[in-house]
Curated annotation (Swiss-Prot):
GO BP terms in the entry: FtsZ-dependent cytokinesis
Name of the protein in its database record: Cell division protein FtsP
Highest taxon of the lineage: Bacteria
Keyword Acetylation annotated: no
HAMAP family in the record: FtsP
Organism of provenance: Gallibacterium anatis (strain UMN179) (Pasteurella anatis)
């Protein structure tokens, strides 16, 4: 075989990729309709089964093996009301042990699940969970020690919505799948057979393609007016910078665990891994709106990605919103929100410094040890945690909630505050943590990197609240 230079190879590859990529833009009409995870609304005391098992899923054109709950890739969306309770049965029909965490659930450590409740194959666990918290958008996913990233990536993911009476009284869109739309973002790499590919060797994983509710480049027909999007970054490591293609602003109305004091108009939304947010998008127009995740890869980036040399996404469309019907007068008015229940001012009783080492997968120079409690906090207290990291990464906390007090030396204004459990740490980040739920040495909470692969490598710790 003659001498074949790298430059000639790249030039040939560019021609191939250009031939494959350019027609796709002209085939936007072939984009799939957005799949909406089935809704399970829970009444008072109702039982729910989450059955983890093997499923078939077509990421590309071929159906391949994946994981999921109740027979589908990704689990059902569970909706509950404040002050309701349910009997939740986790069933493991997979060939390896799993543990499931409901991230954002404000409950005691004994019923929270997570690493404290490891389910062997063909076993089950049935906690009774009471919902005390205000309106929230939570999510459930694998939290198995050393395997949470891989198992979540395979499909052990679902959204969990909590409503309260005050939020129902407001005129916010609340028709699930119509004007209140769940969007679960994942970056996934596929092989030539359309099967998921995952690399466990590094401390982070960046997939090549963006999937939303298990689909690439989906669209949804929506009524004109305000549309509520519940956004969940379910990617292992990748953050997302979300914006509309026409640079139109939208209103952020909530973080994962509560509403903002008032709608916050912005053009870009950053979502850390594991973070949730709610936004309102005005679709009172004649043209489709495209929600995008950063910039799309150009042809060179696509080639580099094909060669394993680029971390750019090959596609960046989250969803295309296609307005239908008559214009809505309501969309001309700025929406109002329920009480954010911030309880300000918060007076911290203690300050802690927490450093995430993204290179060595440690917190404060210590790697995770399931036999060691790293932090003891007092029940019903408030603490200030000062977060830093070697490189920008996500941080999350279980069983408690916090307000983001300061980021990169800038203090957040009151109108930017909302309760959450996840934050992107770039530079110094100060959070005010409120401990409303008890845990114990036998059933501790966890905290640490929201990059699940980094957490699996040891960048997390155990928290006891008493």
């Amino acid at each position: 075989m003659g001498n074949y230079s790298r430059r000639r190879f790249l030039q040939g590859s560019l021609a191939i990729v250009a031939g494959n990529v350019l027609p796709c833009a002209a085939m936007a009409a072939d984009n799939p309709p957005l799949w909406i995870p089935p809704l399970t609304s829970v009444g008072r005391g109702s039982p729910i089964l989450l059955n983890a098992r093997n499923v078939k899923k077509a990421f590309d054109n071929n159906k391949v093996d994946a994981w999921g709950f109740n027979g589908s890739y990704l689990g059902p969306t569970i909706k509950m009301k404040q002050n309701d309770f349910l009997r939740l049965t986790y069933r493991n029909n997979l060939s390896e042990a799993i543990a499931i965490n409901i991230q954002g659930l404000q409950a005691n450590g004994e019923v929270s699940g997570s690493i404290n409740r490891n389910l062997a194959p063909n076993s089950s666990w049935s906690p009774i969970i009471q919902i005390k918290q205000s309106a929230s958008t939570c999510w459930y996913h694998s939290d198995t020690i050393g395997r949470s990233a891989y198992q979540s990536y395979r499909g052990l993911i679902g959204m969990w919505i909590i409503e309260d009476e005050e939020s129902k009284k407001n005129l916010l869109p609340n028709k699930y799948g119509e004007n209140d739309i769940p969007l679960i973002l994942q970056d996934i790499s596929l092989n030539y057979d359309g099967q998921q590919v995952f690399n466990l060797e590094k401390n982070s994983f960046l997939g090549k393609q963006l999937f939303v509710n298990g689909q690439r480049n989906p669209f949804i027909n929506v009524a004109r007016g305000f549309i509520r999007l519940r956004l969940l970054n379910a990617s292992v490591s990748r953050p997302y910078y979300l914006h509309l293609d026409n640079q139109q602003p939208f209103f952020k109305i909530a973080s994962g665990l509560g509403f903002l004091p008032q709608p916050l108009e912005q053009k870009v939304l950053l979502l850390a891994p594991g973070e949730r947010a709610e936004i309102l998008v005005n679709t009172n127009q004649n043209k489709p709106l495209r929600l995008l995740a950063g910039d799309s890869a150009n042809i060179i980036d696509k080639v580099r990605g094909w060669l394993g040399m680029s971390d750019h996404l090959q596609n960046n469309l989250v969803v295309e919103l296609r307005p239908q019907g008559l214009a809505s007068a309501f969309a001309q008015q700025k929406p109002t929100l329920p009480d954010a229940k911030l309880g300000l001012p918060l007076s911290p009783q203690k300050e802690r410094h927490i450093h995430l080492s993204t290179q060595d997968a440690m917190i404060n120079q210590r790697r995770f040890d399931p036999r060691r409690i790293d932090i003891f906090a007092q029940l019903n207290s408030v603490e200030r945690w000062v977060l830093t990291a070697d490189q920008a990464t996500g941080f999350q906390l279980q069983g408690a909630k916090f307000l983001i007090e300061q980021q990169n030396g800038e203090r957040n204004k009151k109108e930017m505050l909302a309760w959450t459990d996840t934050v992107w740490v770039e530079g110094e980040t100060r959070i005010l943590v409120q401990f409303d739920n008890p845990s114990s040495n036998s059933y501790p909470f966890i905290f640490g990197a929201s990059n699940l692969l980094l957490a699996d490598k040891g960048c997390m710790g155990l928290l006891v609240v008493q």
